[in-house]
UniProtKB/Swiss-Prot annotation:
Single GO molecular function: NAD+ nucleosidase activity, cyclic ADP-ribose generating
Pfam family, one: Ank_2
Domain notes: The TIR domain mediates NAD(+) hydrolase (NADase) activity. Self-association of TIR domains is required for NADase activity.
Reaction equation(s) it catalyzes: NAD(+) + H2O = ADP-D-ribose + nicotinamide + H(+)
Compositional bias annotation for Low complexity: 1126-1140
Protein name: Protein tirA
Positions of ANK repeats: 732-761, 765-795
GO cellular component: cytoplasm
Coiled-coil region: 179-218, 1047-1084
Residues of the BRCT domain: 1-110
Function: May regulate responses to pathogens. Required by to respond appropriately to bacteria during vegetative foraging.
Region (Disordered): 186-213, 1120-1140
Organism whose genome encodes this protein: Dictyostelium discoideum
Active site, renumbered: E892
């Protein structure tokens, strides 16, 4: 038979480690295994069927089970909800086994919630009927409790003379009928008396300011009683104060808080003896605190952590994943400005100090009990809340709440303490102190801050000392012991090292968790770093590695203290968070990784925020002006009225600066908040541009692709109102369209294109938006750009966008790019107007072809222009003074006319047009009184709109016939008026064309690429050029040594020569090695000969024999080498004369061999002469006679036909012949040099010495021409890519004296604009001089 749980898998856990829970768990595990079930040791998503809770109790007191309690219960609950696996009571297993079946109805066993507070409570899912009964019982009990507490509240209000204020939402007193009636009546009275109350309050404040200063002294209950007996004025003061307070109501109708003035506790005008308190009444053995006494208090710089915490004002936010929201603003007073300090316990008991130092306290003490919301407490310095109590600092220590462990500062059950109207106290079960009590009147040290734990408190004085009181069962007071007794007396926490008598710890900041405390010691080392001390519970490692009931130094893994500089410290229930910077955070205990990650992403330094403990999570109290406004704007619970008003207050304040506005404008674009953006624009008109990046709000609107619908709101507002330029450039010369291409924002790019942005502006890298979109592989956006006029312009690497595309995308974009509806013909002087014209045409979906973007250096510009005219349907000619005289513009128009294109002129300037040019136009737009140059921007757009409509009608084949008739009549009338002019008058109105024109170019063949580029630039500027290529003819690739063919050939020859050199080096090395080998052999032979001679080294014959042998063998070796060399020479037939010498040397060598044998000692002949061993060398001298090619004979005469002899003419003819001989090499060029207006020399580092000589010769010839006044007639300039060549010593002075122009990628347009202007001046001058000469 199959087992009951055979197919089921269970995961079991118990909430504590107690023996009772452990026993239940073991029994359940055995029962599951016996019945065939599988026990798992972790929850698995797809296999676990049930999660079983093995609990002996339904509620666990954390104080009793603290060390045995396991904190995984809440994690199991969250995991069960996320995976959909139910958590059941162990009774489910017992009932299933008892009934022998799997129970399907789980309502009676399911755990619906786990309440993790002081009591760990497991709530079960009750059946529906039982739930209804329980709800009815709970309602009855709540009504009874409300009625009982209602009476106590009425007594409380009567005692304090206060009206019962409305209670916050969720309060158990909310539904009390008597209070609601009283509230309604009081609300009416407050509205009627509002103005009167305001005047009274203002008068009272003036009186308080006029009062003389006095010292405040806190005394014990016993001392106060004595003074009351002797001073009747004291009693009357309290009575009057209470009576006066009855008339003071909260003027703000929206406040849900009762008001208690802290002046009741501080500014008490008593006649008190200033003598020291007697010992009987001095409960803490501390004398009076005198403000004038010098207590050697350290400087306030020690309290940097505390000062940063209390000097700023802000708002509280909480992170929800990566989003942010304003924290529970409904629980706060409705009209407070901002928060200085905020704390909240896990039960919801909260305290807050606002910007005007008012203190508010509200929230739960237990699940069914709440402290009434206390109103503004003036001049409160500090406050803190624990689990069920609160402590405030205001010239003393004030407490309120539960006093189970003496955490209020007095013995449990004692209600006889001063404050809030004498001894009148209200108690509501379990020692809950509902009114504020002043404790420890004789504690006369100045308190700077206080921090509350769960049931204990720690305070810090201005002397850097720490005191504590309250519960101490886990050593949380730092007194060196742990007990469960009441510790209501304030005691000093000792930080001194018992082994170091000089140790004197100065504490600057404190923070308390659930049952542990942390203190910061400032400037504890010479490097200015801070050190952390901790004590109390260490259940989760929140104070380091070990538990301690006294302060211990928190160390790292290397047992060294951490090095922090003014860190931000916060303690939660079982965690210590230390933040040195938002990027450098350390946690001890339970981790909060997501919260720390949000800190890193949203903050830069600690001055911008503080960390606060909220009921269910950790929040941030934001101080930074920008971050406050930004978080409000980004808040998930954003309210158009409430949040907007808070943001408005922030923006209108003086603290809100321009840098804040720039960043907030970016947030407005991201979240589409136009109202806040208008606020920013109102305060900083036209000044929301980032001063660092130069980004405008139009740039910001392109950054958020996911929120393009929200960004669109800000974008259209800026464009419609023309607040910022649509082509605003940032620091990298990027426009908003560049940003759209980079971030793929198709929707925003469409808006920018429709609004007429410039499609072809380049950034610093020379890239257009089309470059970027193609490189981002955004084909949809690339096609959009091409359809709206983006051109294929090269970047700085001379690559156009199509070169970055794949083959299929490239063909698609090419089809779009080369289908241009409009071809614009213009002069380059009018390029600024033409760019605007192209942009305006783009507004009406017309693509335009411009040579500025199509023609590049090295391309076939004739073919490109021809392709542009052929692929277009309409040609627009821009008429100006320059364009009507441009030869290239006329050629373009003539070609368009031949191809049958429609030609439409646009009058940029009012000029007279000759009939030939006029006859090329197809349409003449309606003439206006103004030219385009004289029109405003709106008028230009209006006229372009009409021309665009005409072009669209032509493209669609629906042009207006009436328009044609009018234009034909205009053309006929114009032709008639032209025919009435005489031929001479017509030519007088036209520019004269003379043969003396153009620019003569000199260049080196090595610079042919640069020369071609310069020629194209001259042609773009309508300057005719001529060079040796046109005169002599461009050399072929084989004749040109710098052609690609010859360069490759030279490279190949160099490679062959390199190989030969390597082989030669190897051969020489072998020969050298052989030579060394021969020398070694000779040496060995000589040594052997000497050994055979049996001569000793001291013998004179030994030395003679040794020298003889060395000379003999060397001679033999030299002759052998010479023979080999001569044989090689003989084979090559290089030298015939050396052959006889070789034979003679061989003969001498053979004769010398008769005198010795290699194996014997040589026989010395008496007739031996060493001179016979020498070689005889013959030399001959060659005499070269140089004859003069020209013999100048002064005595010789020249005879002419007339028979006369003229010595003067002879010398003149001689000079002419010499000049002709000097310029003979440039004979073909002389005529063109003479007829040119401008002479341009290309001079680079590749220019050879020969070319420089040619340059000098041609320059000298050009300078030989003089005008009538004897001045130089030719203008000569030098173009160079390197201006330092002008100062080079190798550059001839005749070239140095000329005008030099340096060209590079940045100023090339400006250089040629200047050259063009120079040429036009020369041309005009020539025309005027020709006219003058013709008139003569």
């Amino acid at each position: 038979m199959p087992s009951l749980f055979s197919s089921l898998k269970f995961f079991c856990f118990s909430p504590t480690k107690d023996t009772s829970d452990k026993k239940i768990k073991d029994e359940i595990l055995k029962k599951i295994e016996v019945n065939g079930g599988t026990v798992q040791y972790c929850i698995q998503k797809f296999s676990t069927n049930y999660i079983i809770l093995c609990n002996g109790l339904d509620e666990y007191d954390r104080d009793q089970h603290y060390y045995n309690f396991q904190s995984n219960s809440l994690l199991f609950l969250e995991k069960s909800k996320s995976l959909g696996i139910p958590i059941l009571s162990y009774k489910f297993i017992n009932d299933c086994i008892g009934k022998n079946l799997i129970i399907n109805d789980l309502q009676g066993y399911k755990i619906s919630n786990i309440i993790d507070e002081t009591i760990i409570k497991f709530e079960y899912q009750e059946p529906e009927e039982e739930i209804k009964e329980i709800q009815e019982i709970q309602e009855i009990q709540e009504i009874q409790e409300i009625q009982e507490i209602q009476e106590a509240y009425d007594d409380f209000f009567d005692l304090f003379g206060l009206d019962s204020a409305p209670i916050a939402d969720g309060d158990v007193f909310k539904n009390m009928p008597p209070i609601s009636q009283v509230l309604a009546e009081k609300a009416k009275e407050e509205k009627e008396n509002q103005e009167k109350q305001e005047k009274e309050r203002q008068e009272k404040e003036k009186k308080e300011k006029e009062k003389s200063k006095f010292k405040s002294t806190y005394i014990s209950d016993r001392k106060l009683a004595m003074n009351q007996k002797t001073s009747p004025t004291t009693t009357s003061y309290f009575d009057n104060e209470i009576d006066d307070k009855e008339n003071i109501n909260n003027n703000d109708d929206d406040f849900d808080i009762d008001e208690i003035d802290f002046n009741l506790f501080s500014n008490i005008d008593l006649e008190i003896n200033e003598k020291p308190i007697e010992e009987d009444f001095n409960l803490f053995n501390i004398g009076h605190y005198d403000d004038n006494v010098n207590r050697n208090i350290k400087t306030k710089s020690k309290f940097d952590n505390l000062n940063n915490k209390i000097k700023n004002n802000g708002y509280i936010f909480q992170f929800v994943n990566k989003d942010v929201s304003l924290y529970h603003e409904k629980d706060f007073p409705n009209n407070f400005k901002s928060i200085k300090l905020f704390e909240q316990s896990s039960k919801g008991l909260s305290c807050m100090i606002t910007e005007d130092n008012r203190c508010y306290i509200w929230g739960n003490i237990k699940s069914n009990q709440k402290v009434e919301q206390l109103a503004d407490h003036y001049q409160v310095d500090y406050c803190s809340v624990g689990g069920s109590h609160s402590v405030m600092i205001k010239r003393g220590i004030h407490t309120v709440g539960l006093n189970k462990f003496g955490q209020l500062g007095y013995k449990n059950g004692n209600t006889n303490c001063i404050g809030g109207g004498g001894n009148n106290k209200l108690m509501i079960e379990n020692q809950i102190q509902r009114s504020i009590s002043i404790i420890n009147q004789n504690f006369l040290k100045k308190v700077l801050m206080v921090s509350c734990g769960k049931d204990f408190n720690v305070l810090l004085t201005n002397e850097g000392q720490v005191f504590s009181w309250g519960k101490n069962d886990q050593g949380q007071l730092g007194l060196g012991n742990s007990d469960s007794k009441e510790n209501y007396e304030i005691k000093l926490v000792n930080f001194d090292d018992p082994y170091d008598s000089n140790s004197n710890k100065f504490i600057s900041f404190i923070s308390c968790g659930g049952n542990h405390s942390i203190a910061i010691e400032s400037n504890s080392s010479t490097d200015g770093n801070c050190r952390l001390y901790g004590w109390g519970s260490n259940s989760q490692g929140q104070i380091g590695e070990k538990y301690s009931s006294v302060p211990i130094l928190i160390k790292n893994q290397d047992q060294k203290s951490f090095n922090w500089k003014s860190p931000l410290v916060l303690c939660t229930q079982d965690t210590t968070i230390v933040v040195e910077t938002p990027l450098k955070c350390t946690t001890f205990g339970v981790k909060f990784n997501s919260f720390l990650m949000n800190l890193k992403e949203n903050f830069q330094d600690l001055t911008q925020f503080d960390i606060v403990v909220l009921k269910k999570r950790i929040g941030v109290l934001v101080y930074d002006e920008y971050l406050k406004a930004s978080f409000l704007l980004r808040s998930l619970n954003y309210n158009e009225n409430y949040h907007y008003q808070l943001i408005k207050l922030i923006i209108e304040s003086n603290k809100f600066q321009h840098s804040h506005a720039v960043k907030l404008a970016k947030d407005c674009c991201e979240y589409g908040n136009l109202k806040v953006f208008k606020l920013l624009e109102h305060k900083f008109p036209l000044n929301l541009i980032d001063p660092v990046t130069l980004e405008s709000p139009i740039h910001y609107s392109t950054l958020f692709n996911n929120n393009h619908l929200k960004s669109k709101i800000i974008l259209e507002y800026c464009l419609i109102n023309k607040i910022y330029s649509i082509d605003q450039l940032n620091k990298q010369k990027e426009t908003p369209l560049h940003y759209c291409s980079r971030f793929g924002n198709y929707e925003i790019a469409t808006i920018l294109l429709v609004r007429g942005c410039n499609r072809n502006l380049k950034d610093v890298q020379g890239q257009t938006p089309l470059h970027i979109s193609v490189s981002q592989t955004n084909h949809q956006l690339s096609s959009l750009l091409c359809k709206h006029g983006a051109q294929s312009i090269p970047d700085k690497t001379m690559k156009n966008p199509l070169q970055y595309c794949s083959a299929d995308i490239k063909s698609n974009l090419q089809n779009i790019l080369f289908t241009n509806e409009v071809f614009i013909s213009y002069a380059h002087k009018d390029s600024e107007f033409v760019n605007n014209l192209r942009s305006n045409f783009g507004l009406f979906s017309l693509r335009c072809w411009l040579d500025e973007y199509r023609l590049q250096a090295g391309c076939n510009w004739r073919a490109e222009i021809t392709r542009g005219v052929v692929n277009s349907d309409v040609v627009v000619f821009v008429i100006s003074e320059t364009s009507i005289n441009s030869l290239w513009c006329r050629k373009e128009l003539k070609m368009s006319k031949k191809l049958g294109k429609v030609i439409i002129p646009i009058f940029l300037q009012s000029v007279q047009i000759d009939p030939i040019l006029y006859g090329l136009f197809t349409f003449i737009p309606k003439t206006t009184k103004k030219t385009f140059k004289e029109m405003s921007e709106k008028e230009v757009i209006s006229n372009v709109s009409s021309i665009s409509n005409l072009i669209h009608s032509i493209l669609n084949g629906t042009q207006d016939s009436k328009l044609l008739t009018i234009q034909q009549q205009q053309q006929q009338n114009f032709e008639k008026s032209v025919q009435s002019l005489s031929r001479k008058e017509f030519f007088d109105k036209c520019y004269l064309n003379d043969k003396n024109s153009g620019c003569y170019l000199l260049f080196n063949n090595a610079d042919r690429i640069l020369f071609d580029f310069i020629c194209d630039k001259f042609k773009e500027n309508s300057i005719p050029t001529i060079s040796s290529d046109e005169i002599i003819g461009r050399p072929s690739d084989q004749d040109d040594q710098f052609s690609l063919f010859n360069l490759m050939k030279q490279k190949k020859q160099n490679s062959i020569q390199r190989k030969k050199n390597i082989e030669l080096e190897k051969k020489l090395k072998l020969e050298n090695d052989e030579k060394l080998k021969q020398q070694w052999k000779i040496k060995r032979k000589i040594e052997k000969k000497l050994e055979k001679s049996k001569l000793i080294p001291s013998d004179p014959n030994y030395q003679y024999l040794e020298n003889y042998l060395i000379q003999l063998y060397n001679f033999k070796n030299d002759n052998e080498n010479e023979i080999n060399e001569n044989e090689n020479n003989n084979n090559n037939q290089n030298n015939q004369n050396n052959q006889n010498n070789i034979i003679q040397n061989n003969y001498n060598y053979n004769n010398n061999n008769n005198y010795y044998d290699d194996n014997d000692i040589p026989i010395l002949n008496n007739n031996f002469n060493s001179s016979e061993l020498n070689n005889n060398y013959f030399s001959s001298s060659t005499t070269i006679q140089i004859e003069d090619s020209y013999n100048n004979n002064n005595n010789q005469a020249i005879y002419y036909d007339d028979g006369k002899t003229s010595e003067e003419e002879f010398y003149k003819q001689l000079l002419i012949e010499k000049e002709n001989e000097k310029y003979h090499s440039i004979q073909p060029l002389k005529e063109f040099i003479k007829n040119s207006l401008l002479m341009c020399i290309l001079f680079t580092r590749k220019t050879t010495k020969t070319e420089i000589e040619k340059y000098c010769l041609q320059i000298e010839y050009a300078k030989s021409f003089k005008d009538e006044k004897g001045n130089q007639d030719k203008t000569i300039i030098v173009i160079t890519p390197d201006l330092s060549l002008k100062d080079n010593q190798n550059t001839p002075s005749i070239i140095k004296d000329l005008v030099w122009y340096e060209i590079d990628s940045k100023n090339i347009d400006l250089i040629f604009e200047n050259i063009t202007l120079m040429y036009e001046v020369l041309e005009k001058t020539l025309q005027i001089s020709n006219l003058v000469n013709n008139n003569k």
